[in-house]
């Protein structure tokens, strides 16, 4: 039975969204146990499940505007810190939070800990593509600066994730760059290209451009954290803008527009589903000794349940264990 520690007090709609998502997950899966950390009285208002779930009460929580490292050190009884400590102590197998991203990264680094020989854990998320499969990208902002070796490690981690969690055999790995030619890019990109091309265990397809990402050009895309975070926000904004403009045009376009929308109802619903990647779960701080997953601060119960499903898959496929085994080989090389 796998145990998942949940910071029930993090996020815009805590604890309701976290607890209702937990209820859904417990109905869907019979092989997980959930530990909810937070205000017991508030959690019980929404908790309908009675089996395979427990509550660890705490009055303390980390707020969205708290300074991350300071919050982890000073709020030692907060729901997020206690959830991370449970993993470190072996009382839980993974952590889920919708709270302060920086604080969760700090909790992952300083409490859960890095896998040996991983230089810098990266933030990985599955982002949407027009055909619906999506692609995994990292780093999405865990690190402001990266070296070529960091990006090389991200390619290996991303490949493990795509293959183990998403079931993609020999995932195609692309390096985000300003052109597809091998000679393109700054020194970081050029050095990374050489490292990736030299590793035959990776299905490296070369450089990929940002304009091709949502067309499914690669299954795994690696980049530095600064660039990755900018791309993430650009994709989020583009998806929201497209759906918002469609809705505005339909509502303000008169009878013909409304009739057209009615005829295209199923197609529009499919488009919305493809652009909405919440079903893929949350962002994984990959490279740690256990899954630490951040779901969006505005997540609803459905998204929380999807993130629990994602964590369950990570645990059952032992993607972290595979990473530990792979990176332990570096000591013998």
UniProtKB/Swiss-Prot annotation:
InterPro entries: FA_synthesis, Phospholipid_synth_PlsX-like. Its main location: cytoplasm. Its EC number is 2.3.1.274. It is an enzyme of class 2 (transferase). Catalyzes the reversible formation of acyl-phosphate (acyl-PO(4)) from acyl-[acyl-carrier-protein] (acyl-ACP). This enzyme utilizes acyl-ACP as fatty acyl donor, but not acyl-CoA. Homodimer. Probably interacts with PlsY. This is Phosphate acyltransferase.
């Amino acid at each position: 039975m796998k145990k998942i520690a949940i910071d029930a007090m993090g996020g815009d709609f805590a604890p309701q969204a976290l607890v209702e998502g937990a209820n859904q997950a417990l109905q869907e899966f019979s092989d997980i146990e959930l530990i909810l950390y937070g205000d017991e009285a508030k959690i019980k208002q929404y908790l309908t499940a009675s089996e395979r779930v427990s509550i660890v009460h705490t009055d303390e929580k980390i707020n969205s505007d708290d300074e991350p490292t300071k919050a982890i050190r000073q709020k030692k009884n907060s729901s997020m810190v206690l959830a991370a400590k449970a993993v470190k102590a072996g009382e839980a197998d993974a952590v889920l939070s919708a709270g302060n991203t920086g604080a969760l990264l700090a909790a992952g680094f300083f409490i859960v800990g890095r896998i040996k020989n991983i230089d810098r854990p990266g933030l990985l998320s599955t982002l949407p593509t027009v055909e619906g499969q999506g692609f995994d990208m990292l780093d999405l902002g865990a690190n402001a600066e990266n070296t070529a070796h960091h990006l090389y490690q991200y390619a290996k981690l991303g490949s493990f994730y795509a293959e183990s969690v998403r079931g993609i055999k020999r995932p195609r790995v692309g390096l985000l760059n300003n052109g597809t030619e091998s000679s393109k890019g700054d020194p970081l990109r050029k050095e990374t290209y050489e490292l990736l091309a030299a590793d035959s265990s990776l299905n490296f397809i070369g450089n990929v451009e940002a304009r091709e990402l949502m067309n499914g050009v690669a299954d795994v895309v690696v980049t530095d954290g600064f660039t990755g975070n900018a791309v993430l926000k650009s994709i989020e904004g583009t998806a929201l803008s497209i759906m918002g403009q469609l809705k505005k045009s339909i509502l303000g376009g008169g009878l013909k527009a409304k009739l057209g929308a009615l005829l295209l109802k199923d197609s529009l619903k499919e488009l919305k589903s493809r652009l909405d990647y919440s079903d893929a779960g949350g962002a994984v701080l990959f490279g740690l000794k256990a899954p630490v997953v951040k779901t969006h601060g505005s997540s609803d119960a459905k998204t929380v349940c999807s993130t629990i499903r994602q964590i369950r898959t990570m645990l059952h496929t032992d993607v972290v264990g595979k990473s530990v085994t792979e990176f332990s080989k570096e000591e013998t090389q």
